[in-house]
Amino acid sequence: MPGVQGVVPPQYIRSMTPETQALVRSATASAAVPFVPEVTLRTAAEPFGLWDRTERDAPPFWAFPWAGGQGLARYVLDHPETVAGRRVLDVASGSGLVAIAAAKAGARTVLATDIDEHALAAITLNAAANGAPQVSPRRLDLAAADHGDAEVILAADVFYQRDLAAMALVFLKAARRAGAAVLAADPARAFVPTAELAPVMTYEIPVLQVLEDTAVKTVTIYSLP
């Protein structure tokens, strides 16, 4: 297959269909992530054209490196002890950026979860391109509140909508009670449950101005006590 060094290894094929991978390939090109240049992602050059192409489906969040994901990926790579040798679950993985960073930081396994089949295809292609065989794309319904045997939960950019933020917090708190470490990242969106989270550090992240109405976002990395 073109675009991933000619071949997608067998462990990635299960999360792709011809239709979803064709759309991801045709709508994106590989590019280094601005704040995480160790990772390349299939990224859309023209956001609104892709939004129009996928208007019958979930929004194409998988086609862009969002601010929270860039921040959490940077944190994990700079602090590999948070994931090294551990089973990791990445919530609402989108492009797979955070999951790939966790794999590069030495995670034992990484479940990169999303509900959008195009996101799962993007994760598949991006993980293969970055040589991250620990990453396994999976569907995950947050309402099920089942984090499996994950020892670390990573969640970036999940607090942008009221109902989703509430559901995500329930999921994260359940995982924390079960003993998993939880790290989240967000650029101060309206529904971040700051009263429940402990700030760890902040980053100034370059973002697409056409999507965020600014060229830089301040992202906070949080832990869940």
What are these regions (language model features)?
Residues 4-225:
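S-adenosylmethionine-dependent methyltransferases
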